[in-house]
Amino acid sequence: MNTSITARELFEQQRERLGLRWAAGKSGEKRELEAGNTVSRRPSLAGYLNAIYPNKVQILGTEELSWLDALEPRQRWETIEKIMQSHPLALVLTRNQPCPEDLRAAADESGTPLWLSPKRGHELLNHLSYHLARTLAPRVILHGVFMEIYSIGVLITGEAGSGKSELALELLSRGHRLVADDAPEFTQIAPDVLDGTCPELLQDLLEVRGLGVLNVREMFGDTAVKKNKYLRLIVHLTKPMTEPTPHGYERLTGDSGTRHVLDLDVPLITLPVMPGRNLAVLTEAATRLHILRTKGIDPAAMFIARHSNLLERRTP
C-alpha cells in the first residue's frame, strides 16, 4: 500500500503540537512526500539545514540562520536557491525567529512551504521525524479478525465461511478483546514490529453471518475493544485434508510455520475446522503454545528428546 503526505496535511496534523504558523510559500501546500521514493534514500525525513544532502523537512535554527548571514551576498543567494531547488516538503524556522526577507521571497517564488514555530530545533526534529516515519511506514491490509488474546496480538484468518467471526465472538465472550474485523491494517513501525489498527469505518464493529453487524463496545463494554496491538501470531482456519498425511510428525509438532508480512515472518499455526471442535479453546491453546515457544519451551522437542533418551537406555 502506497503512503504519502502533503505539506498541508503535515501542517494541520502538527499545527497545535508544534505551534506552527505559515510564513510563506502557501502555493506549495499540495507538495507531496511519498514513502516509496524517500524512506530508503540517504537524506533524512527531517533534519537541520543541509544543502549537500537536503532533508525532506529542513529545520533552520539560530545557528543555521547565523551561517547564512555570514555568507557573501552572492553566495547566500546561490545557497538559498539551491535549498529551494531541492524541493523540500517544508522549511521550519525555530523559536519564532524573524524570517529573512530574501528567504521569504524565495519560498514564495518557488512555492516552498515556510513555517514558523516557537519550539526549539531538537523538539521539532524529534516530533517531525517520528511523525513522518510513522505516517510513511510500509503498511498492508490483511483479511481476517485481529484480536488481543492473552495480551498478544493474534490475527485469525481463513476462507470465507470458515467461522472466523463466530470464533471471534466466542473469544470476546471469554474475555478477550477485538482490534479489527475484516480489514485490519498493519504498519511496520520498526524492523521487527507490525502494529495492527482498525480502519475508522469499522471501529468497534464485528460482522457475524445470521446476526449482521454487531457493535462490540456496546455489547461487551469498553474493555472488549482495543485501539491497536502488535501482531505476534497468525491462526489460520482451514478445512481438513481429505487424504491422510504420509507421516505422523505433524501430530507431534502441530501444523506450524510462518507467513511473510511486509518484511517480517510472522509465526503461523493452522487449525483444521471440523464439527465438534471447540475452536475458541484451540485458539487459546495455540496462543499459550506460542508464548511458551517464545520463552524457549517446546513441548514437542522435549518429548522427542525424552523418547530418544529412553531408546538409548533400552538399547543393549
Curated annotation (Swiss-Prot):
For this protein's source organism, the top of the classification is: Bacteria, Pseudomonadati, Pseudomonadota, Gammaproteobacteria, Lysobacterales
Reactions that this protein is recorded to catalyse = [HPr protein]-L-serine + ATP = [HPr protein]-O-phospho-L-serine + ADP + H(+); [HPr protein]-O-phospho-L-serine + phosphate + H(+) = [HPr protein]-L-serine + diphosphate
- Is ATP-binding among the key words of this record? yes
Q: What else is known?
A: Both phosphorylation and phosphorolysis are carried out by the same active site and suggest a common mechanism for both reactions.
Q: Which InterPro entries match?
A: HPr(Ser)_kin/Pase, Hpr_kin/Pase_C, Hpr_kin/Pase_Hpr_N, P-loop_NTPase, Ser_kin/Pase_Hpr-like_N_sf
UniProt superkingdom: Bacteria
Question: Where, by residue number, is the active site?
Answer: 143, 164, 182 (proton acceptor), 251
Annotated stretches, region: Important for the catalytic mechanism of dephosphorylation: 272-277
Q: Where is this region: Important for the catalytic mechanism of both phosphorylation and dephosphorylation?
A: 206-215
Pfam families for the chain: Hpr_kinase_C, Hpr_kinase_N
SUPFAM superfamilies per the UniProt record, alphabetical: HprK N-terminal domain-like (SSF75138), PEP carboxykinase-like (SSF53795)
NCBIfam families named among the record's database cross-references: hpr-ser
Q: Describe its function.
A: Catalyzes the ATP- as well as the pyrophosphate-dependent phosphorylation of a specific serine residue in HPr, a phosphocarrier protein of the phosphoenolpyruvate-dependent sugar phosphotransferase system (PTS). HprK/P also catalyzes the pyrophosphate-producing, inorganic phosphate-dependent dephosphorylation (phosphorolysis) of seryl-phosphorylated HPr (P-Ser-HPr).
Residue positions binding Mg(2+) = 165, 207
Its GO biological process annotations read: regulation of carbohydrate metabolic process
**Organism the protein comes from:** Stenotrophomonas maltophilia (strain R551-3)
What the entry says about domains is: The Walker A ATP-binding motif also binds Pi and PPi.
Q: What is its EC number?
A: 2.7.11.-, 2.7.4.-
Q: Which key words are in the record?
A: ATP-binding, Kinase, Magnesium, Metal-binding, Multifunctional enzyme, Nucleotide-binding, Serine/threonine-protein kinase, Transferase
Quaternary context: Homohexamer.
Task: Report what the protein is called.
Answer: HPr kinase/phosphorylase
**Tagged with keyword Nucleotide-binding:** yes
Q: Binding positions for ATP? A: 158-165
